[in-house]
Amino acid sequence: MADLNAIADQIQGLTLLEASQLVKMLEEKLGVSAAAAVAAPAAGGGAAAAAPAAEEKTEFTVVLTGAGANKINVIKAVREVTSLGLKEAKDLVDGAPKPIKEGVSKEEAATIAKKFTDAGATVEVK
């Protein structure tokens, strides 16, 4: 069998026009189409690459859905997590459902959700 490294080096040294001619020549001799072979793996690879990205979410949003009976404790929790002023925190709690914090990690979202649940609020992690 021919030395594959030598063949690879020769192909690497081809110009774009020569590479195109080589592809056409191989298509004719082997009776295949390079366009179909190239398109199929690209489509399959793209779909396979998109699926894990949808499964592994890395950024979460914590949404306050309700203040509950202990509104003052919830306002304090909002101020701790977001460093908003008293008026802004009260407006956020009164305007629920509203996002408290966006683009946080799963662990941080769980910590924030627990803090609000302990304060008497209802939260949702998206």
UniProtKB/Swiss-Prot annotation:
InterPro entries per the UniProt record, alphabetical: Ribosomal_bL12 (IPR000206), Ribosomal_bL12_C (IPR013823), Ribosomal_bL12_C/ClpS-like (IPR014719), Ribosomal_bL12_oligo (IPR008932), Ribosomal_bL12_oligo_N_sf (IPR036235)
Domain of life: Bacteria
Biological processes annotated in GO: translation
Name of the protein described by the UniProt record: Large ribosomal subunit protein bL12
An MF annotation (GO) of this entry: structural constituent of ribosome
Entry's Gene Ontology cellular component terms: cytoplasm; ribonucleoprotein complex; ribosome
Matches recorded under SUPFAM superfamilies: ClpS-like, Ribosomal protein L7/12, oligomerisation (N-terminal) domain
Entry keyword Metal-binding: no
Function, in words: Forms part of the ribosomal stalk which helps the ribosome interact with GTP-bound translation factors. Is thus essential for accurate translation.
Quaternary structure and partners: Homodimer. Part of the ribosomal stalk of the 50S ribosomal subunit. Forms a multimeric L10(L12)X complex, where L10 forms an elongated spine to which 2 to 4 L12 dimers bind in a sequential fashion. Binds GTP-bound translation factors.
NCBIfam families xref list: L12
Gene name linked to the record: rplL
Sorted UniProt keywords: Ribonucleoprotein, Ribosomal protein
Family in the record: Belongs to the bacterial ribosomal protein bL12 family.
Organism: Solibacter usitatus (strain Ellin6076)
Record Pfam families: Ribosomal_L12, Ribosomal_L12_N
